Every structure is written in C-alpha cells, then in structure tokens.
Amino acid sequence: MSKWAEGRIVGNRQWTNRLVSLQIAAPEVGFVAGQFARLALPALPGSKESMLGRPYSFVNPPMQAPHEFYFNVLPEGPLSPRLARLNPGEPVWLLDRANGFFTIAELPASEALWCLATGTGLGPYLSMLRTDEPWEKFEHVVLVHAVRFAQDLSYSDVVAALATK
C-alpha cells in the first residue's frame, strides 16, 4: 500500500501568475520518465481526508534530483494555489510510488517520435526526452509545444538543449 513521503520545497519558479514549477527534495520515489506522482498538503479543516492530493507529472528525468513538477494554478482550486505559494524549506508530501503508462516503453517501434504538447503537458515529454531511451529507440524526435501566449513558453532553455541532440 502506498504511503505519503514528506519532501521539502527547494525551488519555486513562477513562470507566470498561473504557471509554476516546484522543485522538491524527497525520499526516492521510483518512477519511469513520463509517469506522475501525487503531491499533497494537509487537508483543510472540515475535510474528511487527512491529505489533499492531486496527480502531477514529473518534469525531471528519473536520474536527476530534485523532483520537479510543472502545473497550472487554478485560482479557485483546493490545492494548486496552496502549492504555488510554498517557499523553499516548506514541507510537501508525495505518494511513495509513481503511476501512469505514458512512457517510451509503451510506444511501438517506429521511425519518428512526435511529442505534441500544449501548456503544462510539456512536463512529461521533458522527463522522457532527457533520458537516452527515446534517442536510442527513434531515428527522429520532434517536440511541439503549443501555447496561447508567448509568455507561456516555459523551459525554453531545456527545449533548446534538446534540439542539439
């Protein structure tokens, strides 16, 4: 059975007023690039649950610390605004195992890998493309990141580095 593992915020990057990346130092959470973890904070008073958790995709590759998550802040949401306000040193909880089948191993062999992302959907692709697996499995790798506004083009330095592969 999965348990909550306590981590600490080591970085909080506010890309825009609604796009945030959190870097979290936490006990090892085994995952495959493309998977997601549940992040949580203590539930607010009156809740039936002790923790309020939601799924967020890893942005970092499995061999890189700290864990990184990229998300939209939903102003009226119960969790994302609270996560966005966390400062370095503050606690956050992760479920001790990752989930999801959006991984390179699940893809059939082909000549090209097309990675089409909008907004924060870029996150799992960055996790995958920073491993060797897609570059060994596919002859061509194409990443498309579509956003509404230029200011929402996050991680341009990472994307530029990937373009040199």
Which residues does each predicted region cover?
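Ferredoxin-reductase
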Residues: 2-90
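FNR/FR-type flavoprotein reductase catalytic core
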Residues: 78-165
